[in-house]
Amino acid sequence: MSDYKHTLNLPETAFPMRGNLAQREPKMLEQWYETDLYGQIRKAKAGKPKFILHDGPPYANGQIHIGHAVNKILKDVIVKAKTLSDFDAPYVPGWDCHGLPIELQVEKKHGKPGKKLNLAEFREKCREYAMTQIDQQRTDFKRLGVLGDWDNPYLTMNFKQEADSVRALAKIIDNGHMHQGFKPVHWCTDCGSALAEAEVEYQDKNSPAIDVRMPVAATAETVDRFSTPEGHVGEGNVSMVIWTTTPWTIPANRAVTLAEGLEYTLVQVEASDDQPAERVILADDLVNDCMERWNITHYHKLGFCKGKDLEGLQLQHPLFELQVPVILGDHVTTESGTGCVHTAPGHGVDDFLVGQKYGIEVYNPVGDNGVYKDDTPLFAGQHVFKANEPIVDKLREVGNLMHAESYRHSYPHCWRHKTPIIFRATPQWFISMDKKGLRAGALEQIKKVDWFPEWGQSRIESMVEGRPDWCISRQRTWGNPIAIFVNRETEELHPNTLELMEKVAQLIEKDGVQAWFDLEPETLLGDEADKYRKVTDTLDVWFDSGVTHHCVLREFDGLRWPADLYLEGSDQHRGWFQSSLVTGVAMYDEAPYHQVLTHGFTVDAQGRKMSKSIGNVVAPQDVMNKLGGDILRLWVASADYSGEMTVSDEILKRSADAYRRIRNTSRFLLANLSGFDPKQDLVAKEDMVELDRWIVGRAADLQNELLEAYNNYQFHSVVQKLMHFCSIELGSFYLDIIKDRQYTAKSEGLARRSCQTALYHIAEALVRWMAPICSFTAQEIWDLLPNERSQYVFTESWYQGFDEFSGVKDAENEFWMQLLEIRDVVNQALEQSRRDDVIGGSLQAEVTLYADDELAAALNRLGEELRFALLTSEAQVASINDAPADAVKAEKMALAVSVTKSEYKKCERCWHHREEVGTLENHSDLCQRCVTNIEGEGEERRFA
């Protein structure tokens, strides 16, 4: 017996079966940055149409988490896909660098600003800390395979960007959108300063909980608003009853808030020994609770109405000669109290927001030290927490105290002093939503933007419709300054504010924000300096990031305004999408983006958020170190990001399995292109074997589908289609069929070259389809493909070699897709024969396909080549009427299959069992086909 191994075309490739991505990827990254891959892409796409994805800046604090990874990978997939679509798509990453979390980190190490370090030194430490965090995050982002201008990112703390933020504010002021007002903030009376949310901790505390009567100003008018039975209007004074655990805020009461759709009841309280009859207004759901709390047993309901029916009603302040209105708000609940909410806009966020809608005074009688100001009636000079008891006594004295008790609840405390804090209105700077039509302009612009998913539009519309004026000022140390001068007497801006702000911006551009804080007013104002106060407030960090469309898109070379796309998590409808929209319209009357895409949050397999305490955190660093960046990228791309994205070790393992299928397909393609030179060996379409031509046509049509999915940001659809093609049409059909021809046909013969031509076209396309998602693996494949080529797949365009193949003829496509189904039936029959010990491998089998006339005609077209398509040694077609009872029948077509074991010897080279094996002179162990392939001109194939 001869050894024919040397006559076979055995697959050969340097592309390993195992990816070893965790070890291989870092080496590839090293090369990418040594050879300036990003710069090469920019040169390759110079002059092409621009596509600008503007990066929403992550905060420069802490390690990246899985949500960061999702966000950056999605952006990278889009940028790479757009680059392949022949766009010049630069990606400039950014970081948000100012604000409280960084201050707190520096404070932990160096103490409060102004203590161990002066303010300038403290700011410098903040800058240094932010830079260390940026470096750490940048390393992780690059490890994900995200390509961008990492050496030149935008940082909101770069001097130029700090200066441009001041210029952005100047433009907003110039357009008339900024004004001064009041807003309640967390206030520590021990610190004597405002606290941010992060500086507040909650502890249990006992507070006096009081129910307070607020008499109605017009009794008859009030009763008329309730649907009461005729003649049953009750007797006694009418009051609306409020409930509060902060009696010290009663002097600042300026309204009572009800829920619009809630049912309210007019309740008759009957006279008792020590109390005359009276009527009270309460939420119907809380009547029983209130009566029980007040120890009232004799009462009945007189009438009902909705909260909206009581809007505008005037009430008497419980302590002062003052009338306050009834208003409506969304924050009213029936969880506790009376359903009638005491509203002091100077001492609560909800109170402030609802008060703004009604134009209600923001009254704050409390000074920095927590003491009532001198002009506060009755309680001037008293500390608010010591005033609770005198206020309760006064309410009792004037007959407006319904009930008082001690109430234990969670209450905000200062994280430094561990003492209770208050809400207190302080002067702040606002961007007005309505003064110059900003809200209307923003709502108009929202309609012009494409939102992915579509519900994003209604979500941001409702938020913009309901949002209050934007408070842009903060009393912080580390931030961009509100670089303005205010008249000490009138509180008006300096008349030359715009020119002064430009001068300040120039100083900041040179020396950073410290230039403003060091600036002596005389330097710019000269003799006028005494008349003006230099504002020391800093800008809300949402303003910093919200004006990056101005500071980055309009200022960085190679970018342009507006952006084509903003892409962030769905929480950014409230955050960056909205701050960017508001500033864009305030500055330029236009949204700074054409499209907005949002992704959901990551949750575990049970739908729970990632939490260290639960122990379900999936760290991207761990995934990359264990499985590799491409597995993480494949998971992100295959998830439907429009909702919550589920991730767990098991889900990532499934992604790794899917990756292996793609890798194995790629390896087969590369291994069978060994020795193939497209310049010499490529077969023209019309000369190709029909099956080869068909699969290339399928790939061409698939490319059109994939490009559409990429353009619509449907990456999970890209992955599904790619996996289906690799697993079904290639893996279990085409590649399975062609192995015999590929390995045994004459090396230089048309039968094999046709097959290699198909594999080459598919490989050239597949590597590009994969590149945006499995970037590392795509480049690994690219390096091993035949033919001269550029260094990187990322500088390329989608495969252009499909032009003549796209649009496979319907009849041809239908036949091969039908054959795919026929093979499934044949495989069932073969499997049954294996179980029955009739055959071992499929090449021991001879099959008969019993079909109706139409199908039989289609199958007979293949003639001798049908057996190759079915992977059997013989295949013949007969009438369905002659099918034996034990034949395996198809469910969806007129087909039955029977299997018999071949009686012929096996060819030692191709393993087919053929009649002539053992009869050929000089080659007694070969079939005629193999002899032709070894010694002749090679077999001919037309179909398969």
UniProtKB/Swiss-Prot annotation:
It holds the Pfam family zf-FPG_IleRS. One of its GO terms (molecular function) is isoleucine-tRNA ligase activity. A motif ('HIGH' region) lies at residues 58-68. Its EC number is 6.1.1.5. GO terms for biological process: isoleucyl-tRNA aminoacylation. Gene3D superfamilies: 1.10.730.20, HUPs (3.40.50.620). It comes from the Bacteria. Monomer. Catalyzes the attachment of isoleucine to tRNA(Ile). As IleRS can inadvertently accommodate and process structurally similar amino acids such as valine, to avoid such errors it has two additional distinct tRNA(Ile)-dependent editing activities. One activity is designated as 'pretransfer' editing and involves the hydrolysis of activated Val-AMP. The other activity is designated 'posttransfer' editing and involves deacylation of mischarged Val-tRNA(Ile). This is Isoleucine--tRNA ligase.
